[in-house]
């Protein structure tokens, strides 16, 4: 039984995956097991809307940095996207050419602002949501 894979082994393997590989893994798991990773979020949103009148709105703590365009400096934007995300050249190029697409999701306000600044310095446009 020494050949069994532990949870720690799975987590270590997942840590080494790129964002694109993780996205494909999530889609595969959703299809294979007939579930949706977005379902808990939808339930939380409905519950949050019901309780919103009673409680003041909470400050948003997680933001998405969405690449909306690359201007005339596509190569420079690809280089910055690679540096930020750790993606390979092809994956970063596909992300940039497929804009609008998220560069990073669920990051702090400071990190999202930093990403926006770096992309805009090389001529791209980013929207923080």
UniProtKB/Swiss-Prot annotation:
GO terms for cellular component: cytosolic large ribosomal subunit. GO terms for biological process: translation. One of its GO terms (molecular function) is structural constituent of ribosome. SUPFAM superfamilies: ClpS-like, Ribosomal protein L7/12, oligomerisation (N-terminal) domain. Homodimer. Part of the ribosomal stalk of the 50S ribosomal subunit. Forms a multimeric L10(L12)X complex, where L10 forms an elongated spine to which 2 to 4 L12 dimers bind in a sequential fashion. Binds GTP-bound translation factors. NCBIfam families: L12 (TIGR00855). HAMAP family: Ribosomal_bL12. Belongs to the bacterial ribosomal protein bL12 family. Forms part of the ribosomal stalk which helps the ribosome interact with GTP-bound translation factors. Is thus essential for accurate translation. PANTHER family: 39S RIBOSOMAL PROTEIN L12, LARGE RIBOSOMAL SUBUNIT PROTEIN BL12M. This is Large ribosomal subunit protein bL12.
